[in-house]
Amino acid sequence: MFDQLVLASNNAGKLKEFGALFAELGVTVRPQRDFDVPECPEPHHTFLENALEKARHASRLTGLPALADDSGICVEALGGAPGVFSARFAGEPKSDARNNALLVEKLQGEANRRAWYYCVLVLVRHADDPQPLVADGIWLGEVRDEAAGEGGFGYDPHFHLPGYGVSVAELDAAEKNRVSHRGQALAALMAKLKALA
């Protein structure tokens, strides 16, 4: 087992969440900015390919094991869109407000509001790792026209959880981290790592 890895992201929230869990295994997680690793392009049409590209990129430039994720919202009535384009659905520069407005606009008159958040995590032990560790999670919900809640980010105010009766933005942060698509993927990845330790 390695004692440190690079997170192929500069997101402070992800660093904190991943850092706490990997600390249980004696692994220090460092953001790619610590190594001056530039953002990796995401040219692919699947979450898995993008996450693998980011992990290999960070590992290649640092010489360390690397962890990357890719995630987004998929809407059944839109054929799975915005999917891998979730962050830039309404174009550049990225804007949660514009992305949400476009999503609601595209669903006008559509009865089927079924959607899911998807996350895949990829861990490579080295840049050319032939057998990366992969874990994913899916969180089912539905898109609502009206935003609800102040928490979260991205599509959370419009992503309603029928089982909870609230939007993701209204959910307690600790509960969200436990049951979300990212939480599910992280739990699955940690189980795989512990089995290898």
Swiss-Prot record:
CDD domains: HAM1 (cd00515). GO terms for cellular component: cytosol. Its EC number is 3.6.1.66. The active site is at D70. Substrate binds at S9, N10, N11, A12, G13, K14, S71, F153, G154, Y155, D156, K176, H181, R182. Mg(2+) binds at D70. It catalyses: XTP + H2O = XMP + diphosphate + H(+); dITP + H2O = dIMP + diphosphate + H(+); ITP + H2O = IMP + diphosphate + H(+). SUPFAM superfamilies: ITPase-like. It holds the Pfam family Ham1p_like. Keywords: Hydrolase, Magnesium, Metal-binding, Nucleotide metabolism, Nucleotide-binding. GO terms for biological process: nucleotide metabolic process; purine nucleoside triphosphate catabolic process. PANTHER family: INOSINE TRIPHOSPHATE PYROPHOSPHATASE (PTHR11067:SF9), INOSINE TRIPHOSPHATE PYROPHOSPHATASE/HAM1 PROTEIN (PTHR11067). Homodimer. HAMAP family: Non_canon_purine_NTPase (MF_01405). This is dITP/XTP pyrophosphatase.
